[in-house]
Amino acid sequence: MAIILASQSPRRKELLRYLVTDFLIEPADVDETIQPSDEPEDYVMRMAQAKAAKIAAHHPADIVIACDTIVVNQGEILGKPVDRKDGYRMLRALSGGVHQVFTALVIRQGGQITTALVPAEVTFFELTDEEIQNYLESGEYADKAGAYGIQGGASLFVKQIVGDYYSIVGFPVG
């Protein structure tokens, strides 16, 4: 029996390695299109379940771990930015305000499915255009929900966190 992380996220890989040293990585490619009618909590759980199901279909006896993370700002679900302009739009919208982060965790083995939805709240300082442009220039924004990674350069944007830090990173291990 193998443990499979259904993610290509280096952050999730690093955090799982603290818990288990021997696991496989098999990213799940699923359609992450956000529909206008999607509720944030339902959407993020549906994505994590879809990723777990896709990998579990090929590995029914193994343990499959999948996660999905979204940022929600004033009711808008912010997934990964499509380009730098979208990243700028997201960071500008988050600047000086409070937003929510939801990470859904799904663990599947055979017919057994365990799920968790872990919320957190993040307050950003007011960001200058120069700060946003410098961060975008680093490239860190590109593969992250809400266009930022709290464990990187964007940690300087954070005024306050309420909830699970690791949920914001994308893998709630606490």
Q: What residue ranges belong to the model's regions?
A:
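N-terminal beta1-alpha1 ligand-phosphate binding loop
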Residues: 1-21
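A local structural micro-motif
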Residues: 23-24, 144
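Cofactor-binding loop segments of dinucleotide-utilizing enzymes, especially the Rossmann-like FAD-
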Residues: 8, 28, 110
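A short beta-strand-loop structural module common to alpha/beta enzyme folds
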Residues: 24-33
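A short, surface-exposed loop/turn module that caps and links secondary-structure elements
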Residues: 34-38
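Anionic-ligand binding patches
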Residues: 3-4, 39-174
